[in-house]
Amino acid sequence: MKLNEIRDNEGARKSRIRVGRGIGSGKGKTGGRGVKGQKSRTGVAIKGYEGGQMPIHMRLPKRGFKNLFRPDYNSVNLGRVQAAVDAGKLDKGATVDAAALVAAGVIRRAKDGVRLLAQGELKAKLSFEVAGVSASAKEAVEKAGGSVTVVGPKAKAAAE
């Protein structure tokens, strides 16, 4: 056997069929697509249909669900709070809660509470009443001389 004698096995490569080239070809006019209907038109694919093969969304396992009662918190970074204090929208000694943040324009509306996050720097001594707080944010507030109280549904979890 020589390199120039190597060939594919018989039937390994199927020759393509040219459709729509006359009645005598056996695949003329409609080209094996049948008559009329969505599937006979060009440019139309049925979403998720993989030619009879089991579609990907059915091959993969079902997973999880969307909890309708999951609380939706407003995330507020310490940098935003400090900017509001610097602009005179928040009092330095006041207690900062969801209502105060809405009034200051830091958040548009209070959802299920406010979660305090640590991005940015807080210089003002403030006491916060929030639904949730990250460990680093709590540390930063206490470092600035303030305090954080967790209120609402997360308060029970924090107390335990």
From Swiss-Prot:
Signal peptide: none annotated. Keywords: Ribonucleoprotein, Ribosomal protein, RNA-binding, rRNA-binding. GO terms for cellular component: cytosolic large ribosomal subunit. GO terms for molecular function: rRNA binding; structural constituent of ribosome. Residues 1-13 have a biased composition (Basic and acidic residues). Pfam families: Ribosomal_L27A. GO terms for biological process: translation. Belongs to the universal ribosomal protein uL15 family. Part of the 50S ribosomal subunit. NCBIfam families: rplO_bact (TIGR01071). HAMAP family: Ribosomal_uL15 (MF_01341). This is Large ribosomal subunit protein uL15. The lineage of its organism: Bacteria, Pseudomonadati, Pseudomonadota, Alphaproteobacteria, Hyphomicrobiales. The gene is rplO.
